[in-house]
Amino acid sequence: MQQFKALLLKEWRESVRSFKILWIPLVFVLLGISDPLMNYFMEDILQAVGNMPDGFMMTMPEFQPADLLIASTGQFQTIGLLVLITAYIGSVSRERQNGTATLLYVRPMSFTALFFSKWIVASIIAIISAMAGYAGSMYYTVLLYGTVDLAKFLAMLCTYCIWLMFVMALTVAMSAAFQTSVAAAVTIILIPVGLLVDTLIGSFWNVTPWKLAKYGTGLLTDNVLMENYWYTLLVVLILIVVIVGIGIKMSKKNIRYLKV
């Protein structure tokens, strides 16, 4: 336990020292507030820009509060996930490549503690970022469009946090299994590309990890079959356990990549 606490503190200090605790949440805040503000002021922006043909008229769609939160989730699912993957894809492999891990591996060490420390800190940063992003989106949504059911919003937020734990578990596990460039390629294929594929042809199946965030937003509008939601949530939780186990095993197995 003492070793785990020391490793956890090390990872946390590294995230603070590299300002990940600051700039990643800031990115999510900017993504979160962009949709409510842009959609609300779009007509004014178009008028200010000018150069519109005479007689040109544009009817702006009327958004419901839930629509803006769903749009913000879409931003998090694209740009936000790429930022998180980029920030933590080298959490294990980069230490092996630059020799930093030598300071850890020269003494008896629990690879379980090592992996958990990296995954937990990455998940905490991801969850803080999502909460900050949704807070910004919620603030301007309520201010400009109307209220949102708080219980449904919290259910969606908790669901998205579990999804982020899955994403960060996969990211750190890929970093443990491969060298940085390969890990990045595999993770990007599995997460963002997987989401794209699920969006295009996902109507053929109802239960996949990539649908969890979508089902979470469906809680806002009561537009989700709860049976599919619970099965998907269960699949994601099981996969988290499996991926963490694989990550721990690969962390130990790939000591051979260590550069002294």
Model-derived regions, located:
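Aromatic- and glycine-rich beta-strand/loop motifs that create alpha-glucan
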Residues: M1-F28, R256-Y257
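Central hydrophobic cores of alpha-helical transmembrane segments
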Residues: I24-V29, A183-L195, K211
